[in-house]
Protein backbone atom coordinates (compact mmCIF):
# COMPACT_ATOMS: atom_id res chain seq x y z
CA UNK A 1 0.00 0.00 0.00
CA UNK A 2 1.53 3.29 -1.13
CA UNK A 3 1.69 6.10 1.40
CA UNK A 4 2.77 8.73 -1.08
CA UNK A 5 4.16 9.44 -4.47
CA UNK A 6 7.18 11.26 -5.76
CA UNK A 7 6.73 12.73 -9.21
CA UNK A 8 9.83 14.11 -10.90
CA UNK A 9 10.39 15.67 -14.27
CA UNK A 10 12.73 13.75 -16.55
CA UNK A 11 15.32 16.08 -17.97
CA UNK A 12 17.76 15.43 -20.78
CA UNK A 13 21.45 15.25 -19.93
CA UNK A 14 22.72 18.79 -19.35
CA UNK A 15 25.45 20.53 -21.30
CA UNK A 16 27.04 21.28 -17.94
CA UNK A 17 26.39 21.34 -14.22
CA UNK A 18 27.06 24.31 -11.96
CA UNK A 19 27.37 24.67 -8.22
CA UNK A 20 25.78 27.87 -6.92
CA UNK A 21 26.26 28.84 -3.29
CA UNK A 22 25.31 32.00 -1.46
CA UNK A 23 26.33 32.61 2.13
CA UNK A 24 25.67 35.51 4.49
CA UNK A 25 28.61 36.63 6.61
CA UNK A 26 28.26 39.30 9.32
CA UNK A 27 31.52 40.97 8.25
CA UNK A 28 31.65 40.58 4.48
CA UNK A 29 27.96 40.47 3.61
CA UNK A 30 26.68 37.98 1.07
CA UNK A 31 29.12 36.00 -1.05
CA UNK A 32 28.21 34.15 -4.24
CA UNK A 33 30.25 31.12 -5.24
CA UNK A 34 29.81 29.67 -8.72
CA UNK A 35 31.67 26.56 -9.76
CA UNK A 36 31.75 23.30 -11.60
CA UNK A 37 28.93 21.31 -10.05
CA UNK A 38 27.62 17.80 -9.78
CA UNK A 39 29.75 14.92 -8.60
CA UNK A 40 32.99 16.69 -9.56
CA UNK A 41 32.38 19.83 -7.47
CA UNK A 42 34.64 18.87 -4.57
CA UNK A 43 37.06 16.91 -6.74
CA UNK A 44 37.90 19.80 -9.08
CA UNK A 45 37.49 22.77 -6.73
CA UNK A 46 36.77 24.93 -9.78
CA UNK A 47 35.03 27.98 -8.28
CA UNK A 48 34.75 31.74 -8.52
CA UNK A 49 33.53 33.87 -5.60
CA UNK A 50 31.91 37.29 -5.81
CA UNK A 51 30.62 39.65 -3.13
CA UNK A 52 27.07 40.90 -3.65
CA UNK A 53 25.65 43.01 -5.13
CA UNK A 54 26.45 41.63 -8.58
CA UNK A 55 24.98 42.09 -12.03
CA UNK A 56 24.44 39.61 -14.84
CA UNK A 57 27.65 40.64 -16.64
CA UNK A 58 29.72 39.91 -13.53
CA UNK A 59 28.06 36.51 -13.16
CA UNK A 60 28.78 35.70 -16.82
CA UNK A 61 32.40 36.79 -16.37
CA UNK A 62 32.75 34.50 -13.33
CA UNK A 63 31.29 31.55 -15.27
CA UNK A 64 33.67 32.33 -18.14
CA UNK A 65 36.66 31.97 -15.79
CA UNK A 66 35.71 28.41 -14.80
CA UNK A 67 37.58 25.46 -16.30
CA UNK A 68 34.09 24.21 -17.20
CA UNK A 69 33.50 27.26 -19.44
CA UNK A 70 34.59 25.67 -22.75
CA UNK A 71 32.02 22.90 -22.27
CA UNK A 72 29.31 25.53 -21.77
CA UNK A 73 30.20 27.42 -24.94
CA UNK A 74 30.10 24.61 -27.48
CA UNK A 75 33.35 22.71 -27.01
CA UNK A 76 34.28 20.52 -30.00
CA UNK A 77 30.96 20.95 -31.76
CA UNK A 78 28.80 20.16 -28.75
CA UNK A 79 25.71 22.33 -28.12
CA UNK A 80 26.08 25.62 -26.28
CA UNK A 81 24.56 25.85 -22.81
CA UNK A 82 21.63 28.10 -21.97
CA UNK A 83 23.81 30.55 -20.06
CA UNK A 84 21.04 33.16 -20.10
CA UNK A 85 18.80 30.80 -18.13
CA UNK A 86 21.62 29.91 -15.72
CA UNK A 87 22.37 33.58 -15.10
CA UNK A 88 18.66 34.34 -14.58
CA UNK A 89 18.49 31.58 -11.95
CA UNK A 90 21.67 32.77 -10.22
CA UNK A 91 20.49 36.38 -10.18
CA UNK A 92 17.14 35.31 -8.69
CA UNK A 93 18.97 33.54 -5.85
CA UNK A 94 21.24 36.55 -5.31
CA UNK A 95 18.27 38.91 -5.20
CA UNK A 96 16.50 36.64 -2.70
CA UNK A 97 19.54 36.71 -0.41
CA UNK A 98 19.80 40.49 -0.64
CA UNK A 99 16.10 41.07 -0.02
CA UNK A 100 15.45 38.60 2.81
CA UNK A 101 17.72 38.84 5.85
CA UNK A 102 16.32 35.55 7.17
CA UNK A 103 18.17 33.64 4.44
CA UNK A 104 21.56 32.55 5.76
CA UNK A 105 22.62 30.29 2.93
CA UNK A 106 21.43 28.86 -0.37
CA UNK A 107 23.19 26.02 -2.14
CA UNK A 108 22.20 24.48 -5.46
CA UNK A 109 24.25 21.56 -6.73
CA UNK A 110 23.80 20.86 -9.47
CA UNK A 111 22.16 23.60 -11.45
CA UNK A 112 21.75 21.55 -14.62
CA UNK A 113 22.26 23.83 -17.61
CA UNK A 114 20.55 22.52 -20.74
CA UNK A 115 21.33 23.46 -24.32
CA UNK A 116 20.61 27.01 -25.45
CA UNK A 117 16.91 27.82 -25.20
CA UNK A 118 16.12 24.84 -22.96
CA UNK A 119 16.68 26.36 -19.53
CA UNK A 120 18.46 25.52 -16.33
CA UNK A 121 17.06 23.25 -13.62
CA UNK A 122 18.05 23.06 -9.96
CA UNK A 123 18.32 19.33 -9.34
CA UNK A 124 19.16 19.64 -5.64
CA UNK A 125 18.94 22.65 -3.34
CA UNK A 126 19.29 23.46 0.34
CA UNK A 127 18.21 26.73 1.97
CA UNK A 128 19.16 27.66 5.54
CA UNK A 129 16.79 30.11 7.22
CA UNK A 130 17.60 32.10 10.36
CA UNK A 131 14.41 32.50 12.39
CA UNK A 132 16.11 34.77 14.95
CA UNK A 133 15.27 37.98 13.08
CA UNK A 134 12.66 39.11 15.60
CA UNK A 135 9.75 38.71 13.19
Task: Give, region by region, the residue ranges found by the protein language model.
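ATP-dependent carboxylate/acyl-activation modules
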Residues: 1-135
